[in-house]
């Protein structure tokens, strides 16, 4: 993956946390990719690791008390629903789901029946002319990282060459409506803009609602979507027409399905985020999306080296993390 610059950080290769949960000679793997430091309401890597240690201790307590691992769908309720707990328990949940599917010798498609093939979403940036854009064949929408300010000549040329509609992602970088409207107007001269994503800070539904009336295109919220309560506020204020759901941010796969279903009930268009995940987690995202998301999402294959390619298995998610990746990883906690 090429690095993609956003307004607050350089989106490059993040540290990926893998968790292997083994019990009674059966195991499963989870994966999350926290950002290096806390930003826009999301926890940093160190915070997630601290929360994970507590989550594993909690998992051990529950297992000792009940005599078996909790069902994967219960895991999210074991945490405190904080930003850091959401990511940590999402990691545990994925590992337990993988283990249960392996135990039952079934595939994820048996649990989440595919309804359609979810189109893919690519991510590029207007904030760094030195990094080439990489857009794979078949991409249906392009998320373009941006910030207030004028477009460079290179940025305009790249936008003009796009065949796909654009989603302008501000990553909470705007302060005023005119900053967003100026960028939208400039980009609209050379590309088709479908939506503007998260121009203002997390929780600021009032300013988003006002801006939505002036945009002329859909407004989407990403960092501001963490629970069904957030959806209720978004719908109440008419703050967005679209939402991006990220499984780790909302506390795992079970919560993600609940959030997606509620968003649809509220008439919101939903897409699944997950720019940083490895091919392993992308496979899980794809299974989730194919069962309940029709908007272009982060579900395409990720270009990695042969040593990083996941290993094919017959059940569960159809793959597991590459042995080489796990061998080279630093062990943080062993339960």
What residue ranges belong to the model's regions?
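Residue-level marker for buried hydrophobic side chains located in beta-strands
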Residues: 28, 166-168, 219-220
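Metal- or metallocofactor-binding catalytic centers and their adjacent structured scaffolds
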Residues: 21-22, 27-104
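Structured beta-strand/loop patches that form or line metal/cofactor-binding pockets in enzymes
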Residues: 1-40, 307-310
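Catalytic alpha/beta core domains of metabolic enzymes, predominantly
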Residues: 202-300
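N-terminal amphipathic alpha-helix/helix-capping segment at the start of soluble metabolic enzymes
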Residues: 6-8, 12, 72, 76, ...
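Flexible C-terminal active-site loop/helix
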Residues: 273-335
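Metal-dependent enolase-superfamily TIM-barrel catalytic cores that perform enediolate-based chemistry
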Residues: 106-215
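Conserved, mostly hydrophobic/aromatic
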Residues: 19, 25, 92, 105, ...
